[in-house]
Amino acid sequence: MKKILLYIILFLSGIDGAWALPIEKEGMSIYSPSLKQEVSYAIILPEGYEHSDTEYPVLYMFHGIGGDYTSWLEYGNVARVMDKMIKEGKIQPFIMVIPDGYLSYYSDTYDGSSLYETFFIKELVPYIDNNYRTR
């Protein structure tokens, strides 16, 4: 009986932090006329986003070469870091968007063959502003 009680206590103590994490959404996508393809992105919404009408600032995070839109979530653990810093009062709540940059260097090419900068400024930012409560 003591062994079962110990397992239950360990299990419950391990899940309390999970309830407090911000909302992570991976595999979201937007079609880009500039790039002529779907562009995947991840978005992290602050805790309480779903139950409020608060508008939040947005931070766009870009991954490095060889990474993708999930890199910051998988290797950088940004959702936990973001949540911890908000709870410690070091930063205010915000929305984080991590678009897939492919091998674009996040800029338009001189010959116009890749228009990632155009996509970001004219398509992604307005899309996020229109579909999420941003300020």
PLM regions: where:
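Sec-dependent N-terminal signal peptides
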Residues: I4-G14
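Non-catalytic cap/lid and distal C-terminal segments of serine-dependent acyl enzymes
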Residues: W19-R135
